[in-house]
């Protein structure tokens, strides 16, 4: 009697585990489709083989490892909600390649909502989201132009509160840099 009950329980647990795995796989493939549809990610993927490009995609374990380094940047405000992160930087590319990339990036970023722009020394940093301020959004893009262009794409579940926290940290760090320069 006990053995039959144990076998039934084992079978039920196996079925429940299989259902959970199918559910997880469906959720992961839905996330994969969402990423593939992102115009900013598509732009970065199309430029991946360009000379002078440094790019990195962080997700899963690699993203968890990188969270320690994020503690010193404004990104710490969103690190708990971050699912995926793309980093793309033009360092040694030809000037013409960089001009073409900037033109393509500006076309893609026109479809996003511009949230903030900071001009410091020789660099301009612009923050975009794929939604409206006040809504929940799942993609945030930090676009930096200077000698060399870089773009960081953050994917996850974000709110306006995350933007406010990032801005507060950024302002505090900017003030600290100005006082140390003097």
Q: Each PLM stretch: what is its role?
A:
Residues 14-23:
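Bacterial N-terminal signal peptides
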Residues 40, 156-182:
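C-terminal partner/receptor-binding element of secreted or periplasmic proteins
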Residues 1-9:
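N-terminal secretory signal peptides that target proteins for export/translocation
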Residues 102, 106-132, 178-181:
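Short Gly/Thr-rich strand-loop-strand
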Residues 28-32:
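Boundary at the C-terminal end of the N-terminal hydrophobic targeting segment
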Residues 128-163:
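A short, solvent-exposed beta-edge/loop patch
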Residues 33-101:
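Early exported N-terminus immediately downstream of N-terminal targeting peptides
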Residues 50-53, 80-85, 110, 122-124, ...:
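Extracytoplasmic
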